Amino acid sequence: MSSQLAASSPNYSHSEPADSARHDWPGPPSLVPSQVLDTERLMQVAAARSADYRDAQPFPHIALDGMFSDPLLDQAVAELPAASAKWTTYNTVNESKQVCSDASLFGPTAEIIVHALNSAPFVRFLERLTGITGLIPDPHLHAAGYMKVSPGGFLGLHYDFATQRELKLDRRINVLLYLNRDWQSEWGGALELHSNDPITDPRHREVSIEPLFNRMAIFNTPNALHGHRKPLVCPKGRARLCLSWYYYTAPPVPGWAARSKAVEFRGPMDPKRFAIKAANLITPPIVFELARKVKERFAKR
């Protein structure tokens, strides 16, 4: 697993499969999430790169290459859902893109990848890398999942939502996995990270991350201005494709006392049972046996 910030993409192209082919999924791969990621290597990368992440400007972020095997991601792309009712299209002055958040429609390989990044080992990796503890993955992929931007598409600079209203969680981390074979920089689509609005504040700082195949971008949110402003100029039949995950923390509940080390039982006790137990603690068993025999003797009279 490489942790470099930049790498050249493989020298061959990959076009989107035809809609009709996307339905011909193979059987589910013989993999489980724990086999998809090298968890030992994950923790090594987190330990080695945590300072880089936290010190990065304009806000904490990193780009890591080679997090998955290339053939695994190729298979995921081959199983892309058809660009029909399975995709939600957004065409506004702020964005032009398609999204699909239902992992059951992704195909078996991408679904396993989704589960791998929602698993405990990957969450522990994120916590070690970012320094943010108590991270919670979102199995519902609210506003996450596949995002596809076709020629002419774009995503204006924006701040992400701060709270997942259904689960009442605070959004903390974005993870983007790019799936673009042989991507050319002149096509555009680089992820822009900004410190301030470049229009209203000339002092802003900008970092760009190319959306190369098998590259993962991770950054803090929601106070992170990001996007890709310029319309894509990639060839027809190509698109800027990525999978995304969001991670949250739970806000403290007012009035709740922390009880993390033991279960605290409350409620009525059986007085008779409690009295017998207490008596047993201070009375030798032989006394109880003698009392029983005396009681039986008097009962026979």
Task: Report each predicted region and the residues it spans.
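Catalytic core of Fe(II)/2-oxoglutarate
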Residues: 2-5, 152, 166-171, 181-301
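N- or domain-start disorder-to-order transition segments that initiate the globular core
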Residues: 2-50
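Non-heme Fe(II)/2-oxoglutarate
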Residues: 41, 50-130
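Histidine-centered active-site/metal-ligand motif
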Residues: 61, 158, 226
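A structural signal for well-ordered alpha-helical scaffolds and beta->alpha junctions
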Residues: 69, 73, 110, 119-123, ...
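Non-heme Fe(II) oxygenase catalytic core, chiefly the N-lobe of the double-stranded beta-helix
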Residues: 78-81, 105, 114-171, 180-182, ...
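A structural signal for the main folded, soluble domain(s) of proteins
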Residues: 86, 91-92, 96-103, 129-138, ...
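Eukaryotic charged/polar low-complexity linker/IDR segments
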Residues: 174-176
